Structures are given as structure tokens and as C-alpha cells.
């Protein structure tokens, strides 16, 4: 099944600058599965360790990263336990900015 994943607020740099990805994922996959799948398949090898540290902390999304599932805060949807559905749009937006 297909889902769309989008990155903003600088997170796209960990994913080789690509802000939008359309992914085929197995039915029954959770957001937790998706997080690890993205690190392994969307992050370039030479950026994986640094990118993982920007994106994840303790095997979940790092504090300061807003996650929206179909424009709804992921906390309302079960966070990383949410089971992905066909045509879901998952947005990861960093709320931390340097300055």
C-alpha cells in the first residue's frame, strides 16, 4: 500500500534533501516500523548516523519533531503504534531552529 511521507524544518537534510517521498509499505505496518524503515532506506549511507541522531532519540522521534498523521497530531492517533492506512500522509516537521 502507498503512503506519503513529508519532511520540513530542516529534517529533509537527513534524507538527502528530499522533502516528499511516496512509499510502498506492507499492510499492518506501524509508524514505529516506518521510522526504522526510513532510516535504513531513505537516509544515504554517508549521512545515516548523523541523520539518525537528528531524527530519532531512544528509538522514537526526537523531542522537537512534530509528527502529523493526516494533519492530526500523532499523539491523538496512538503515536508510533498507529497502524498505517492506504494513502496516509505522515509529516515530520522540526520545530527547533538555529539562529
UniProtKB/Swiss-Prot annotation:
InterPro entries with a match to the protein in the record: Beta-grasp_dom_sf, Mopterin_synth/thiamin_S_b, Urm1
Cell location: Cytoplasm
Domain of life assignment: Eukaryota
GO annotations of cellular component type: cytosol; nucleus
Keyword tRNA processing: yes
Keywords: Cytoplasm, Isopeptide bond, tRNA processing, Ubl conjugation pathway
Modification type 1-thioglycine: residues: 99
Pathway: tRNA modification; 5-methoxycarbonylmethyl-2-thiouridine-tRNA biosynthesis
Function noted in UniProt: Acts as a sulfur carrier required for 2-thiolation of mcm(5)S(2)U at tRNA wobble positions of cytosolic tRNA(Lys), tRNA(Glu) and tRNA(Gln). Serves as sulfur donor in tRNA 2-thiolation reaction by being thiocarboxylated (-COSH) at its C-terminus by the MOCS3 homolog UBA4. The sulfur is then transferred to tRNA to form 2-thiolation of mcm(5)S(2)U. Prior mcm(5) tRNA modification by the elongator complex is required for 2-thiolation. Also acts as a ubiquitin-like protein (UBL) that is covalently conjugated via an isopeptide bond to lysine residues of target proteins such as AHP1.
Family of the protein in this entry: Belongs to the URM1 family.
PANTHER family linked: RURM1 PROTEIN
Protein name from the UniProt record: Ubiquitin-related modifier 1
Organism from which the protein derives: Yarrowia lipolytica (strain CLIB 122 / E 150) (Yeast)
Amino acid at each position: 500500500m502507498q503512503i506519503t511521507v513529508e519532511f520540513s524544518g530542516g529534517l529533509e537534510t537527513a534524507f538527502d534533501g528530499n522533502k516528499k517521498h511516496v512509499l510502498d509499505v506492507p499492510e499492518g505496518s506501524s509508524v514505529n516500523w516506518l521510522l526504522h524503515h526510513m532510516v535504513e532506506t531513505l537516509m544515504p549511507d554517508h549521512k545515516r548516523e548523523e541523520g539518525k541522531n537528528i531524527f530519532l532519540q531512544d528509538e522514537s522521534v526526537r523531542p522537537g519533531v512534530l509528527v502529523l498523521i493526516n494533519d492530526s497530531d500523532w499523539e491523538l492517533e496512538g503515536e508510533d503504534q498507529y497502524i498505517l492506512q492506504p494513502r496516509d500522509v505522515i509529516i515530520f516537521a522540526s520545530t527547533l531552529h538555529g539562529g
